[in-house]
Amino acid sequence: MLNGENVDSRIMGKVATRASSKGVKSTLGTRGALENISNVARNNLQAGAKKELVKAKRGMTKSKATSSLQSVMGLNVEPMEKAKPQSPEPMDMSEINSALEAFSQNLLEGVEDIDKNDFDNPQLCSEFVNDIYQYMRKLEREFKVRTDYMTIQEITERMRSILIDWLVQVHLRFHLLQETLFLTIQILDRYLEVQPVSKNKLQLVGVTSMLIAAKYEEMYPPEIGDFVYITDNAYTKAQIRSMECNILRRLDFSLGKPLCIHFLRRNSKAGGVDGQKHTMAKYLMELTLPEYAFVPYDPSEIAAAALCLSSKILEPDMEWGTTLVHYSAYSEDHLMPIVQKMALVLKNAPTAKFQAVRKKYSSAKFMNVSTISALTSSTVMDLADQMC
């Protein structure tokens, strides 16, 4: 093994010899930590050596596919002709502008553009909102529930009404979103359409439908244990989980059917209605939930009919004008049979056995709309009598 001192002396001797051969004065010495690590003093170059370092400047270029530089002197490069940039031909915008103008006039002829002030708010999607609602109308037709699904069931229409009246109370107890309630009933009806359910399992299907809807709509949905408690331990957590899997499989995991409340918001904006009319329309829509007779109608039809009846109750002179016809996609003549059915349900509400919805909308939170005197007006009675 070599001695450390001998190795150091040999290395230092070689450095000194190389420095002297290049005309550099060796100045080896001690240095502090993290200081100059060179053993050669760079400022002691002789004047002659400095002159020798001055060389002719060479043309430089970037090498292909790298950022390093290479000399191009001595290379035989054929000069290339510069390609003259071709300016694009000017686009004739007259036809496009005329087409857009014609489309706009056709869309808005006699119809107020209710989205013209929403372009600065990206959340309102004003550029695509009409396409979105058109797609939603397509979806509601795809998810349409059969009108005769009770024929395959052991349960009856009355049992369905009892269940939904109880679900309205559960929904209110848990302080859930409006969308969650409507989605719960949609899931319930779609499942009953394809799967026979026994009487003792109907409540299980109901609470599980609400659990699924809450997971879909809510930021903080209730836990399974909450639904076990609300059923007074009639079902276990395992039973609810099993039913959840069963419902999702039978519905092919498709839960995106549009809801009445989605269309009502659009219609209320088109009609420029106030909070009371909008809340009254929500009350009318919820009154239809326990009624099996309203299952055949699309959510967009129920929403439009609810707003139409609400307007007739609170503002009899208000017309279902061109703007409302355009954005709701329904004329008043089309809605009138549904409006008359709603009026009959509204007329019978004070004496009906199921009072959950009426009690809910009697609170100040919902403007006490279920208790106002206008609900017993001649307008409501005349519309209801046409169904008798």
Curated annotation (Swiss-Prot):
Pfam family, one: Cyclin_N
GO molecular function annotation: cyclin-dependent protein serine/threonine kinase regulator activity
SUPFAM superfamilies recorded: Cyclin-like
GO annotation, biological process: cell division; mitotic cell cycle phase transition
Disulfide-bond pairs as recorded: none
InterPro entries associated with the record: Cyclin (IPR039361), Cyclin-like_dom (IPR013763), Cyclin-like_sf (IPR036915), Cyclin_A/B-like (IPR046965), Cyclin_C-dom (IPR004367), Cyclin_N (IPR006671), Cyclins_cyclin-box (IPR048258)
Superkingdom in the source lineage: Eukaryota
Keyword vocabulary terms for this entry: Cell cycle, Cell division, Cyclin, Mitosis
Function: Essential for the control of the cell cycle at the G2/M (mitosis) transition.
Family of the protein in this entry: Belongs to the cyclin family. Cyclin AB subfamily.
Subunit structure of this chain's protein: Interacts with the CDK1 protein kinase to form a serine/threonine kinase holoenzyme complex also known as maturation promoting factor (MPF). The cyclin subunit imparts substrate specificity to the complex.
Protein name: G2/mitotic-specific cyclin-B
Organism: Marthasterias glacialis (Spiny starfish)
